């Protein structure tokens, strides 16, 4: 019997012009019609997902929009190819579990 529930999530990556930044694209809307940028961990309160991403020691900033997340790593970090599998697996599991990406109320309250 096929188990029904949360959909299977796939994540692929796209390079950006900045070699320290990588775009992770999901087959699911994450933040429809909006975007939010977290320059550092202290700004990530409105996003449980961003808070979790900042637990990776090499993550410098997080940008969440429509169906993608753009991550910037610290320049001292290993090559993206060394950390992409870990990030992809984390995002896949996080999204398949149906966890909250952005808390809308906190995001609105955090706007300047």
Task: Please identify what each model-predicted range represents.
Residues 50-68:
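Short acidic amphipathic segments
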Residues 17-40:
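Short glycine-/aliphatic-rich beta-strand segments at the starts of folded cytosolic domains
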Residues 77-95:
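Charge-rich, low-aromatic oligomerization/scaffolding segments with amphipathic character
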Residues 98-112:
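Long, charged amphipathic helices and adjacent flexible linkers at domain junctions
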